[in-house]
Amino acid sequence: MMLDTLANALSTIMNNEVRGKKQCVIYPSSKLIVAVLDTLKRSGYIGDFELIDDGRGGKIVVNLLGRINKIGVIKPRYPVKKNEFEAWEREYLPSRDVGLLIVSTPKGVMTHREAKEKGLGGVLLAYVY
């Protein structure tokens, strides 16, 4: 029984990155996982990914590029205002301008830099560097 599918997906990606694999399979799939993977793809941390409907919750095959040093979920999922991102960057990222925080906003899942540009707050989901 999986309680947090996003945490399971990100730990699968991290484990396969450490082992030097080129692909990994994430299951079950969800809209949130697909949105987070799309954000990681736009930021250049992973390659393409493919959704496979197997009739049991679906799978996602992710092509890895070897650019992730650390990825993880942020628990509990803290609410963040548009002017509070710097404090959370210091908490979860190793240095300034290195890595991303992934945020769920009313306009969709995006990086903390995109949320700052658009003047949006949201809920912290994950970090990657």
UniProtKB/Swiss-Prot annotation:
Designated name of the protein: Small ribosomal subunit protein uS8
Gene3D superfamilies (alphabetical): 3.30.1370.30, 3.30.1490.10
Disulfide bonds, paired cysteine numbers: none
Species name: Thermofilum pendens (strain DSM 2475 / Hrk 5)
Gene: rps8
GO CC, alphabetical: ribonucleoprotein complex; ribosome
Family: Belongs to the universal ribosomal protein uS8 family.
Biological processes, Gene Ontology terms: translation
InterPro entries linked to this entry: Ribosomal_uS8, Ribosomal_uS8_CS, Ribosomal_uS8_sf
Superkingdom field: Archaea
Keywords: Ribonucleoprotein, Ribosomal protein, RNA-binding, rRNA-binding
GO MF annotations in UniProt: rRNA binding; structural constituent of ribosome
Pfam family, one: Ribosomal_S8
Top-level taxonomy: Archaea, Thermoproteota, Thermoprotei, Thermofilales, Thermofilaceae
Subunit and interaction comment: Part of the 30S ribosomal subunit.
